Amino acid sequence: MRTLKETSVSFKNIVTLSAVLALLVTAGFARERREVPPLVGSEVGPQMDEIVPKRFIVDPPTIENLGFRWVIEGDSNRNASVAVAFRKKGQRRWKDALPMLRVHHEVSNQAYGPYRTGNLFAGSVLFLEPATAYEVRLTLRDPDGGAPVKPKIIEATTRAIPKAFDGGRTIEATAEKGLMAAFEQARPGDIIQLHPGLYKGPFEFNKSGTAERPIVFRGPTDGEAVLEADGVGGRSRIVTLNGTHHLFFERLTFRNAHTAVYAAKPGGSDGLVIRRCKIHDVVYGINTGCENSRNWFIADNDIIGINPTWYPRPSKTYMSPGHTGVNVYGQGHVICYNRITRFSDSAAIYNFGPPVDDVLKHCVNIDFYNNDLSWAQDDTFEADYGCHNVRFYRNRCYNAHTGMSTQPFYGGPVYLIRNEVYGITSLSYKLNNYPAGILAYNNTTCCAGSGFRPPPIWQNGHFRNNLIMGGSGHALISGSPTPYSTMDYNAYRRNDPDRLIQWTDHRGNRSQYRTLDTFFKATGLEEHGMLADYDVFMKAGPPEQGKTCQPNDYDLRIHKEAKVVDAGVDLAQVTEGFSGKAPDLGCYELGQKPPHYGPR
């Protein structure tokens, strides 16, 4: 949530800066300086170029994706790689997936809580079919030796879309008798059918369903079953879960509470489903900050907060009155096809801080896709405090201070793929607090200010095929302290004839570049980058700062004469099915129908 204001300086100025700090100490101001917590996280192992494969982890699968981690020792020169291929079990032909990301002890959140990431590879196989068994082939190579002779082949199955048990009882619930009276009768596999009416909370459910036989709370098809608490003040919650699992909430209305559904520590909740519900007049919609929460399915909901406006963003109280629409932590969650609006953050990873020591309890393998996210006083999407294989793809974001945030991220990858982002006032990409492991592919982002303006502290980031459009200032003003960060095949808008790029390299040297060619020759970045303008779109202009827009006010599909057609690079699974000589830039391939956003 916090924004770290960064000032990029050359290392040549460190002596001067040190002298100023010494004067402050002499003047007695040192006691006012914030203490940085000690470095925590992974230990640095043996320093050697040869690789030693260690633990291989298959993370809890989601409905469309599989995620993996391969811990290693060595490879200190970072020249090892893991190629990935997959196929449905029983088929013969392998298909390529994206290679695994090399994670190598990057230190995230350096100013507020330094955390050293591990020595590993991490990555996902994307856009798969639900409830389907796959074989995944991982080929580890290292010129310095130590890699297995044969590829590792593992089997993994995507999760099924959750459904009620067919053979359970139906228990009728009425507002007069109360919801708890029906719940006390329920056993795994039952459906509690709520009749229209007002059900006054709070509710704490103390028994669970099972994965095969969940307990389902289902609202009526005619009329509303409304669950409410005591208002947005205090800490009123409608539903609280703590070690209670496999409960489904469907076709219900939640309202008038601080939090609609909360999974508390230490137990959290496994297998929670919230589907086709309406949630409104709340500070938080759905919330868990527990590492033991797993395998949620949050789909097709309308979630509306209490923020009266999204602009201007308050400088000190920007996380109130409405906080976050969907806020999750743990493993295996799916948040899809929701409409979330009028919160400070629309959809987010919970601000957990550094992960616990148990790597199986890290925040991994979480999906956000096909959501409609708007009116965000802070971020439409926030991956802050995630660890590996968090995926944000095919979402529509608009009317927000910030588009996509990763401040910090603990290792990566965090995938940002084919998102439409428009009407941003500050940062399309918020990469503050030294995040590590950002993969941004085929996004279209349109900001009123500079197109790409995160502080020069993001690490191990890789950007391809993006349309990065701004309205004023530099097209690109940023930098990275890791020399292995890469940017190529992206298009930028020149907003100012005298300013194009300001870049701070891994040595701390800041330079200005007036052309992409001089930028490439100096840095090796954007060899195939290009300039573009809003005329590549069917209908769009630079967003005006603070002006509220609606999706029908603009159309970010590209037209067939646009210079960004066929200007991209082929990325396994991401650009599959492109129609021309090469993939197009941005979130929409020419001629392909845009995805559906929000409830179906």
Could you tell me what each predicted segment is?
Residues R169, D190, P314-G325, Q459-R600:
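Acidic, glycine- and Ser/Thr-rich low-complexity intrinsically disordered tracts
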Residues K163-F205, F519, D584-C587:
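Acidic Gly/Asp/Thr-rich repetitive segments characteristic of extracellular carbohydrate-active
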Residues K163-K177, P196, S208-A260, L531-Y534:
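Right-handed parallel beta-helix/beta-spiral solenoid domain characteristic of secreted/periplasmic
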Residues R141-A164:
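Extracellular fibronectin type III
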Residues P214, P220-G223, H245-N256, D270-D281, ...:
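Right-handed parallel beta-helix
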Residues E73-F86:
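Solvent-exposed loop/turn segments flanking beta-strands in beta-repeat/beta-sandwich domains
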